């Protein structure tokens, strides 16, 4: 299994919509809403311009995406990490977090949020990626945990 990352371009918008919709469909069904699900082409094109996105390729097949934004010097936020369901549980997410840490060499702090109810995400970020929960937030009717990794 060969994993590669390619920076997304505007022409990747529809492909990314398909990846996001596949990856976030269960969240949409579970919570009734999900910011990553159901994006329009215009929304995804704007998102690609605003936040660098990297397409996760497994044996050259697009299977996920990771995106990050700079909050301040040496502080970043992972704004999206998604893998299509049939490729989840194969280590791609862990490798994507490592990719982000290597890409932003100056990082001292990386944050992200995920729904508290998604125990598998909480376990993934804390046990496999070295994050810890620092606070809770609410987005509509969804309680979110804010995670941080520091070095």
Place the predicted regions along the sequence by residue.
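Conserved GNAT acetyl-CoA-binding A-motif
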Residues: 97, 104-116
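Conserved beta-strand in the GNAT
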Residues: 55, 61-70, 77-82
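A short helix-loop-beta-strand connector motif used in the catalytic cores of GNAT acetyltransferases and
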Residues: 43-55, 77
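A short, internal acetyl-CoA/4′-phosphopantetheine-binding micro-motif in the GNAT/acyltransferase core
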Residues: 81-88, 114-116
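Conserved beta-strand-loop-alpha-helix junction that forms the acyl-donor binding cleft
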Residues: 111-122, 138-142
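Conserved acetyl-CoA-binding loop-helix of GNAT-fold acetyltransferases
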Residues: 83, 89-102, 127
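A short beta-loop-alpha structural element at the N-terminal edge
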Residues: 4-18
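Conserved GNAT-fold acetyl-CoA-binding loop/helix
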Residues: 17, 21-44
């Amino acid at each position: 299994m060969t994993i590669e990352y390619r920076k997304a371009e505007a022409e990747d918008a529809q492909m990314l919509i398909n990846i996001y919709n596949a990856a976030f469909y269960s969240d949409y069904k579970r919570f009734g809403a999900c910011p990553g699900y159901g994006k329009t082409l215009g929304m995804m094109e704007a998102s690609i311009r605003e936040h660098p996105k990297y397409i996760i390729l497994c044996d050259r097949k697009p299977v996920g995406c990771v995106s990050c934004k700079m909050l301040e010097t040496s502080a970043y936020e992972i704004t999206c990490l998604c893998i299509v369901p049939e490729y989840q549980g194969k280590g791609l997410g862990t490798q994507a977090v490592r990719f982000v840490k290597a890409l932003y060499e100056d990082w001292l702090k990386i944050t992200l949020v995920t729904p508290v109810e998604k125990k598998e995400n909480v376990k993934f970020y804390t046990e496999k990626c070295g994050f810890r929960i620092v606070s809770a937030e609410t987005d509509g009717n969804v309680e979110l945990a804010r995670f941080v990794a520091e070095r």
